[in-house]
From Swiss-Prot:
<keyword id="KW-0488">Methylation</keyword>
<dbReference type="GO" id="GO:0003735">
    <property type="term" value="F:structural constituent of ribosome"/>
</dbReference>
<dbReference type="GO" id="GO:0022625">
    <property type="term" value="C:cytosolic large ribosomal subunit"/>
</dbReference>
<comment type="similarity">
    <text>Belongs to the universal ribosomal protein uL11 family.</text>
</comment>
<keyword id="KW-0694">RNA-binding</keyword>
<keyword id="KW-0689">Ribosomal protein</keyword>
<dbReference type="InterPro" id="IPR020784">
    <property type="entry name" value="Ribosomal_uL11_N"/>
</dbReference>
<protein>
    <recommendedName>
        <fullName>Large ribosomal subunit protein uL11</fullName>
    </recommendedName>
</protein>
<dbReference type="GO" id="GO:0070180">
    <property type="term" value="F:large ribosomal subunit rRNA binding"/>
</dbReference>
<dbReference type="InterPro" id="IPR006519">
    <property type="entry name" value="Ribosomal_uL11_bac-typ"/>
</dbReference>
<dbReference type="Pfam" id="PF03946">
    <property type="entry name" value="Ribosomal_L11_N"/>
</dbReference>
<dbReference type="Pfam" id="PF00298">
    <property type="entry name" value="Ribosomal_L11"/>
</dbReference>
<dbReference type="InterPro" id="IPR036796">
    <property type="entry name" value="Ribosomal_uL11_N_sf"/>
</dbReference>
<dbReference type="InterPro" id="IPR020785">
    <property type="entry name" value="Ribosomal_uL11_CS"/>
</dbReference>
<comment type="subunit">
    <text>Part of the ribosomal stalk of the 50S ribosomal subunit. Interacts with L10 and the large rRNA to form the base of the stalk. L10 forms an elongated spine to which L12 dimers bind in a sequential fashion forming a multimeric L10(L12)X complex.</text>
</comment>
<dbReference type="InterPro" id="IPR020783">
    <property type="entry name" value="Ribosomal_uL11_C"/>
</dbReference>
<keyword id="KW-0699">rRNA-binding</keyword>
Length: 143
């Protein structure tokens, strides 16, 4: 089996189970000759078991024959933190104004979820990375 020639990689963030060929997906795929409706249908099929609307990063590899493959990543840490704290958005002034509190259990749960995609060797290092993200969003982290 001959190896296909990779033309490009496209990185997108799409809502799980609710992706449509409308912007930003269509305009990102169109110039590379990839069928947006075909990608959307495959993406929605693979993400239908996830929470609807949860933002999922996806890396699409486009080949010379206009075919494609894609890899689903874990949701961004900021999205998981906002969901755990039940807040709409982070603080504009993260040092002075705190918008929520993240428990130890929630921190560990988020770290376990992010472990495959995060640059950490163990769960403790992952927890520190997630805690740093939370602090930069104005979320207080329980010690």
């Amino acid at each position: 089996m001959a190896k296909k020639k990779v033309v490009t990689q496209i990185k997108l963030q799409c809502p799980a189970g609710k992706a449509t060929p409308a912007p930003p997906i269509g305009p990102a795929l169109g110039p590379h000759g990839v069928s947006a409706p075909q990608f959307v249908q495959q993406f929605n099929d693979r993400t239908k078991s996830m929470e609807p609307g949860l933002v999922i990063p996806v890396v699409i590899t486009v080949y010379a024959d206009k075919s494609f493959t894609f890899i689903l990543k874990t949701p961004p840490a900021s999205v998981l933190i906002k969901k755990a704290c039940k807040i709409e958005k982070g603080s504009a002034t993260s040092v002075t104004a705190k918008v929520g509190k993240l428990s130890k259990a929630a921190l560990e749960e988020i770290a376990k979820t992010k472990m495959p995609d995060i640059n950490a060797n163990d769960i403790e290092a992952a927890k520190k990375i997630i805690a740093g993200t939370a602090r930069s969003m104005g979320v207080e982290v329980e010690r």
